[in-house]
UniProtKB/Swiss-Prot annotation:
Family of this protein: Belongs to the transferase hexapeptide repeat family.
Organism: Rickettsia bellii (strain RML369-C)
A GO biological process held by the record: lysine biosynthetic process via diaminopimelate
Name of this chain's protein: 2,3,4,5-tetrahydropyridine-2,6-dicarboxylate N-succinyltransferase
Gene Ontology MF annotations: 2,3,4,5-tetrahydropyridine-2,6-dicarboxylate N-succinyltransferase activity
Cellular compartments per GO CC: cytoplasm
A Pfam family matched in the record: Hexapep_2
UniProt lineage: Bacteria, Pseudomonadati, Pseudomonadota, Alphaproteobacteria, Rickettsiales
Keywords: Acyltransferase, Amino-acid biosynthesis, Cytoplasm, Diaminopimelate biosynthesis, Lysine biosynthesis, Repeat, Transferase
Length: 275
C-alpha cells in the first residue's frame, strides 16, 4: 500500500509532464491498473471510517484522476449499444456465469457499473448507474434509475430507491463524497449530494433533497443542522416559513422523529414514515 501511495503522490507532482515520458508512463500505468483492481476488490477505498470519523484517502482520488488523464478512450459495444469512453465496464459483456456466481450479486439488464467500483455480495443492481470509485456494501439494493456518483460510499443493507441521486466527488481532493451508512433507506427521487453523511439506520422519505447548505430541522426543537442526517432519524421534505408573511418560505429537510436501533429493526419503513 505504501508503495502505491508513494508512486501516486510522486506522479501527481509531475502530472503535467507525465504524458511526455513514454517509458515512465508505461511503468506507471501498471501501478494505476493495480489501484483500480484493488478498488474493484474493496481492498482500497476512497473513504474509510476511522475512530468514528470518515477520512478521505485523497491519494486514491489522485489515482483515479491520473487514470483518466493517462487512459485513451476506446470504443465499447454490446448487442444493443455502443459508446466511447476511458473507463471500462466492471463486468465485461462476455463475462461468464462463474464471474457473477463468484461475485454473489444480482445484476439486471440496463444496469451499468464502471470498473474501479466495489460491489459486495448479495447486492442487487437494478437498471442504474454506478460510477468509478464507489463502494457498495453487502445486502444493499440499488433500485431502478438510481445513480451512484464517483467515490460515493454506501453501507450494508441499504435501499437506494428508484430515481435517487447519490452525489459523488473527485475534486476537490479533500472533499468527502456522499456517505450512506449501514441500514439506511433513501426514498424514491431523493437527492443526497455535496458530501452529506446519512448516519446508520436513517430513513429519508421520498423526494427529499439534501446538500451541504440544506437546512435540516428538528421538528420538535427547531434546531437546525447541516451536512449530517443523524442516526435512526426519519426525514421528510418541508418548508421553513418566512418571518414576513408575504415572503416565500424556504425548502428544508425535517427530522420528524428519531427511533432507537431496536425500534428501527422491528418497524417497517412505511410505519415509521406514517406514524
Amino acid at each position: 500500500m505504501f508503495t502505491y501511495i508513494k508512486e501516486i503522490e510522486e506522479a501527481w507532482q509531475i502530472k503535467d509532464k507525465l504524458l511526455q515520458d513514454s517509458v515512465k508512463l508505461s511503468a506507471f500505468k501498471k501501478t494505476l491498473q493495480d489501484v483500480i483492481e484493488n478498488l474493484n476488490k474493496g481492498t482500497i477505498r476512497v473513504c474509510e471510517k476511522q475512530n468514528s470519523s470518515w477520512q478521505v484517502n485523497d491519494w486514491v482520488k489522485k489515482a483515479i484522476l491520473l487514470y483518466f488523464m493517462t487512459t485513451e478512450s476506446q470504443l465499447y459495444n454490446n448487442n444493443y449499444n455502443s459508446w466511447y469512453d476511458k473507463v471500462a465496464p466492471k463486468f465485461p459483456f462476455d463475462a461468464e456465469l462463474n464471474k457473477f456466481k463468484e461475485a454473489g450479486i444480482r445484476k439486471v439488464p440496463g444496469s451499468f457499473v464502471r470498473t474501479g467500483t466495489y460491489i459486495a455480495k448479495n447486492v442487487v443492481i437494478m437498471p442504474s448507474f454506478i460510477n468509478i470509485g464507489a463502494y457498495i456494501d453487502e445486502g444493499t439494493m440499488i433500485d431502478t434509475w438510481a445513480t451512484i456518483g464517483s467515490c460515493a460510499q454506501i453501507g450494508k443493507n441499504c435501499h437506494i430507491s428508484g430515481g435517487t441521486g447519490i452525489g459523488g466527488v473527485l475534486e476537490p481532493l479533500q472533499a468527502k463524497p456522499v456517505i450512506i451508512e449501514d441500514n439506511c433507506f433513501i426514498g424514491a427521487r431523493s437527492e443526497i449530494a455535496e458530501g452529506v453523511i446519512v448516519e446508520e439506520g436513517a430513513v429519508v422519505s421520498m423526494g427529499v433533497f439534501i446538500g451541504a447548505s440544506t437546512k435540516i430541522v428538528y421538528r420538535d426543537s427547531g434546531e437546525i443542522i447541516y451536512g449530517i442526517v443523524p442516526a435512526c432519524s426519519v426525514v421528510v421534505p418541508g418548508v421553513l416559513p418566512n418571518k414576513e408573511a408575504d415572503k416565500p418560505g424556504l425548502y428544508c429537510a425535517v427530522i420528524v422523529k428519531q427511533v432507537d436501533k431496536n425500534t428501527r429493526a422491528k418497524v417497517s419503513i412505511n410505519e415509521l414514515l406514517r406514524s
